[in-house]
């Protein structure tokens, strides 16, 4: 922890007395610049704050490197900024615990004989599975991925639907995060050539070793390489429960990290294995009161991670749930992501949930999408033949 440091100055922009289009362009310029900003690892500060003053509202822009703060930490930062800005100061700056304390604790714990035994069992659990674990979903991805621009698609689950989904999850012995994860997997499988694949699920590794553990800032992220196997002989709720059970099993063996799993998969397959489809949920990590008691409004947010193509993020906001995909925009065929996200959103928001759970094929394309697919379908008789036979016939 730095003993001596200077808090960087906050850049202030006055965006007044201009047309709505000019205002929008100016805000987009600020956002794009902050999104693309590269921070030097190990060099203070790894964050930036700027303010835009409009005629009727003030916008605080926050940019940071997620090496210093995971998604839950960002919520903590925003909550504390808001509390102080609106004069509702809590006892947030008298914490007994620091992120450094957690790192030291973890380092010392790994030296304990009991932890060594846990590590041994967890390593065995993963090594027995790694050789048969599938790679990422086989979606139609363009080979040239030089364009790294990120686009966000989002949807909001209102309070009434949120409570309906929560009850549905409780009644079926699954978590709400697990249900949303299963919807994400269902959509990936629909557009994937393979129905058996792995997803990168980020976990907040905040063990309750201290009362302050959920109020400190740092990167507590661990990743889990979650195997998905879509068996369409099962109902959707059975597939959800299968995914939930697999996730719970994996979570019991987290001392062997997802990074180590990927490293071993790479070694066995003799090629670099990347799982670029990510799922992150902070549901139930903060109290409902904290997640709904915001005075300000979240206008824009986006994240980018090297090699990630789609990052599905789920968080409580106001009285509902905000769900977004941060997508590598140029990686996929035109309109595919819009169709996939629309399908995903409709599963969460509009679908008759009870019927969906009992159904085997839960993805129902809207009529306009069905028409597009129908036009592109061409049925030719399939005649099996050897590779050289077509050449000889010509």
Where are these regions (language model features)?
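Short amphipathic alpha-helices and their capping loops
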Residues: 1-25, 29-33, 37, 43-45, ...
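His-Asp-centered acyl/peptidyl-transfer active-site segments
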Residues: 1-4, 27, 43, 56-57, ...
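Active-site-proximal acidic secondary-structure segment that organizes catalysis
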Residues: 52-100, 333-352
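Flexible, non-catalytic linker and terminal segments flanking ANL/adenylate-forming cores
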Residues: 107-112, 248-250, 265, 269, ...
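AMP-binding/adenylate-forming domain of the ANL superfamily
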Residues: 24-30, 74-75, 101-104, 120-124, ...
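Short amphipathic alpha-helical segments
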Residues: 32-35, 78, 166, 177-185, ...
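Extended, hydrophobic beta-loop-alpha segments that form or line the acyl/peptidyl-thioester binding
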Residues: 72-81, 177, 195-202, 220, ...
């Amino acid at each position: 922890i730095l003993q001596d440091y200077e808090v960087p100055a906050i850049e202030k922009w006055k965006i007044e007395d201009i047309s709505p289009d000019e205002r929008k362009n100016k805000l987009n310029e600020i956002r794009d610049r902050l999104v693309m900003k590269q921070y030097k690892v190990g060099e203070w500060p790894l964050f930036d704050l700027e303010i835009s003053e409009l005629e009727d509202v003030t916008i605080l822009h926050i940019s940071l490197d997620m090496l210093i703060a995971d998604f839950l930490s960002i919520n903590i930062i925003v909550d504390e900024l808001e509390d102080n800005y609106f004069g509702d100061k809590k006892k947030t700056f008298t914490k007994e615990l620091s992120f450094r304390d957690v790192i030291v604790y973890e380092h010392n714990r790994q030296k304990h004989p009991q932890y060594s035994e846990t590590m041994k069992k967890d390593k065995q659990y993963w090594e027995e599975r790694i050789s048969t674990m599938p790679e990422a979903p086989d979606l139609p991805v363009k080979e040239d991925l030089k364009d790294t621009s990120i686009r966000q698609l989002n949807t909001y689950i209102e309070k009434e639907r949120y409570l309906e989904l929560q009850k549905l999850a409780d009644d079926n012995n699954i978590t709400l995060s697990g249900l949303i994860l299963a919807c994400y997997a269902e959509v990936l499988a629909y557009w994937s050539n393979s129905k058996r694949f792995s997803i990168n699920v980020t976990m907040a590794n905040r063990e309750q070793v201290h009362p302050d553990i959920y109020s400190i800032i740092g990167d507590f992220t661990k990743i889990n390489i979650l195997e998905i196997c879509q068996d369409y002989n099962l109902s959707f709720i059975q597939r959800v429960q299968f995914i939930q059970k697999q996730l719970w099993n994996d979570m019991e063996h987290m001392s062997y990290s997802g990074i180590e799993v990927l490293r071993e998969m790479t070694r066995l397959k003799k090629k670099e294995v990347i799982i670029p489809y990510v799922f992150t949920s902070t549901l139930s990590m903060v109290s409902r009161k904290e997640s709904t008691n915001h005075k300000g409004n979240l206008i824009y947010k986006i994240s980018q991670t090297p090699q990630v193509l789609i990052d599905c993020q789920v968080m409580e906001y106001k009285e509902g749930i905000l769900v977004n995909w941060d997508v590598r925009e140029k990686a996929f065929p035109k309109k595919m992501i819009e169709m996939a996200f629309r399908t995903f959103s409709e599963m969460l928001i509009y679908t008759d949930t009870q019927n969906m759970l009992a159904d085997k094929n839960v993805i129902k394309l809207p009529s306009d999408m069905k028409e597009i697919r129908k036009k592109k379908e061409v049925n030719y008789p399939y005649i099996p033949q050897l590779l050289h036979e077509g050449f000889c016939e010509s």
